[in-house]
Each structure stands twice: as C-alpha cells, then as structure tokens.
Amino acid sequence: MTPVIALVGRPNVGKSTLFNQMTRSRDALVADFPGLTRDRKYGEGNYEGQKFIVIDTGGLTGDEAGIDAEMARQSMQAVEEADIVLFLVDGRAGLTAGDEMIADYLRKSGKQAHLVVNKTDGQDPDVAAADFYSLGFESTFLIAAAHNRGILSLLEALLPEPENPEDQDRADRYPGIRIGVVGRPNVGKSTLVNRMLGEDRVVVYDMPGTTRDSVYIPYERQGHEYTLIDTAGVRRRKNVREAVEKFSIIKTLQAIDDAHVVILVIDAREGLVDQDLHLIGFVLDAGRSLVIAINKWDGMDPEDRDRVKEQVARRLDFLDYADKYYISALHGTGVGTMYESVQACYESAMSKWPTNRLTAILQDAVAQHQPPMVHGRRIKLRYAHQGGSNPPVVVVHGNQVDSLPGAYKRYLENTFRKVLKVVGAPIRFEFKSGENPFATKVDRLTPRQKVKKDNDLKKGRRIKKTRQKSVKR
C-alpha cells in the first residue's frame, strides 16, 4: 500500500516548501479542491522506487475554535488519513504555545508522528532544535526545506522498505481489465458501478477495506473478465441510493494508479467544472487510458444538452483521442456501449510494437514534415523503439533532440496515434541523443595528411616572411 504522509504545523513554518521538495516539482500532481479539501493539497512523490502520497495542510494555530476552525478541521482530517505525520516547527521562531498544543493533539491521536525542525540554515542546528526536545517526540529531524537539506535523510528514515512483490502487485492479482471509476462527489459513481455490475446480475457483497482503501470487485461480462475499482464505497444492492459521498483524493489516486482504464464520471446537469479538470490532470499524469461518461443525461432539455456538448467539445478539445459517452447510470442508457471503448483502450495501452514498424512510422513522418533547423543544422531523428506499456512509451533516437519544439513532438504523437490506431491511451515520447562515436578518439592524421599539414605550415611561414619584407621596404 502506498504510504501517506501528512505535513502539519503552524502557518508559515515551511510545510508548502517541504511539500514541493518532496514531490520534486512546484506543479507536481497537486489538487486543491475548494469546499471539499480546502487548505489540503495532495501530491505524489517517489524515493528510490518507493511511491508515497503527501498531504499539505493549511496550518494549525493550536486552537480549534480560532479564527479559521475549518482550516483546523481539514488539518485534523489529514492526520486521520495519514500513515505518517510530520510535525513541522520553525527553528528560527523557537517553541511557541501553539506548537505545544499541536504536539498534545498529535500525541492523543495515536498516529506515528515525527518532529521536523525546519529553517535550521544559517544557525547551529542543535541550538535551533534545543527548545523542541521538551515536546517529547521519539524522533527529531533537522532540515532546511528551502535549500533541500536533510530531506533525503528524512525520507530514508521514514519510508518503509519496499513491499514484497506479492503485496506490491496486489492489483495484478485481480483478473482481466481493471477499470477505475472516478469523479466528484454525487456525480453518480455508485449508481454507475452498480449498473455495470448489475448488467450480468453479479451479486455485490461487502468487502473489507479501510476508509482510504478502494474496493476491488471482479466480475465477468460476455466472456470477458473485469475488475472494477470502486472509490465510492458500493455495498449491497439495497443500499444503492446515492448519498452524499465522502470524497477521498487518496482513493482516487490509488484507483487511477491501479487501473488499466479510467472512467471519469461528469454530472451533465452541473456541466464541466474545474474539479473535473483536476481529475483529468491526475489521469493524464498517471498515463492511464481514459473514457469520459457524462452522466444524468436523462430528462435534460435539448437546449441544455446542446450547451453541455458544446462545453465538453470546447474545454476538452485536448482529449480528442478519448471517447465520450452521454449516459444515464440510473436507467442504464448508454452504459453497455462503454465496454467497447474500455476494451479498445486496454488493447491500445498494452500494445507491443516491433522496432522496425515504429522506425518506419518515424521515417514517414519526417519525410512528410522535417524537423526544424537548429544553429544551421537539421535535427535528425534516426530510429524509434518501444520503451514500455500502460502508457505506451516510444523512444526516439537522434541528434539535437533536446531542441525539438513542442509543436513537432505533438505532430509525432498525432502521427503515431493515427497510424497505430491508439484509442483512449496517451502515448509518451522519450527523446535520446545518440553519442558521437568519435568523441573519445584521439585525432590522428594519416601520413599523407601529415605531409600536407607540414607543407601548409611552410607555405604560411613563407607568405608571412614576404609580407614582413614588404613592410620594411
């Protein structure tokens, strides 16, 4: 299971800076969902192959009834979701009453909490941390998040050893195509999951799982095996009525990561909103195949339907490769037709292509539209081969590929997608420059070249002497 790390502490102690360092990017996989996860940001990190999720909170003042009680509630919710809690304090400001109250709350929570003294740069770290030892935490780490000091040691000490392959690949133990159904609260995820399962009269039963674990439900349909990854908490058929869901980013990230194909459910009556785009960003960053289901299509006026279709076409024009379905999960309209896209997405994501075919596509693309010139030299793309699947990765070798414009990369992606007939799945490209085979060789002249060089030098000396004599005269 992916470890979840929560960062808590007073405002402005460096939580967001540490968050950015742990996710290794200021625009890493980050979501900020107003109203649902206010003042909580979620990101993914990776340390030596060990993935983890980081939750950044807005800050605790130590007083739950303070100016922003909602901020305190969200921070406490992050603590409940986490496996590991990092309690950040400011080494420059020293120990405060707010720090003491937060420490007391963490002790009562029973969570695995560690003290992290930040902003220790420019002073003696031991002196900066001295006051905080009185808080009584078993482990204390000294870091300078702004300068990325001490963070790798922190991760090395806290993250568990990689799980054994049997546990690590638990998703692989489930048969067939794994389908993750994700979406905002109350868009109809539970209804859709039960409709998909109910089409073959599969009995849905309670399965064990914690508050942040997705539920894996294997089933068969028309001779094909599938596993639905449920983030909405589907239970017995008698409890199918859509209630207010508890939205969990943790479940969503887990479902996307484990899935072969992701079905994103959008509420047609509310239209496409920013939170939907955030979720699409999660799917694209994970490189998963995508099918979009616009739900609650029944009972809408023709004018409203046209408006929604226009909005989807305009705001999702960058997803022209993903199939879009207008469905009613409640009545089952259009649900069965999605399986055709699910199957096509899976086949595209798991495809294997020979090197000679990929190279031929590359050469044809270059012949039709050559790469631009850089410093008077044409960028050359020599050959291509496959570097992975789910998502499909195409590795292109050439020279000066670092200078290849984004527009040309998109041209290559569209060309490969069209020729290979890839549906629903993103194609990732990696560009590698070929090394110069003569770079490490000593420049040795042949005997003939040596004679020519000597003659040129002698000729140059004679010309120089002649010019000097002319100047003296």
From Swiss-Prot:
Q: Which NCBIfam families match?
A: GTPase_EngA, small_GTP
| Binding locations of GTP 1 | 9-16, 56-60, 118-121
Give the residue ranges for region: Disordered. 444-473
Q: Which CDD domains match?
A: EngA1 (cd01894), EngA2 (cd01895)
Q: What is this protein called?
A: GTPase Der
Q: How does it assemble?
A: Associates with the 50S ribosomal subunit.
Against PROSITE patterns, the record matches this protein to: G_ENGA (PS51712)
Alphabetical list of SMART domains matching this protein:
AAA
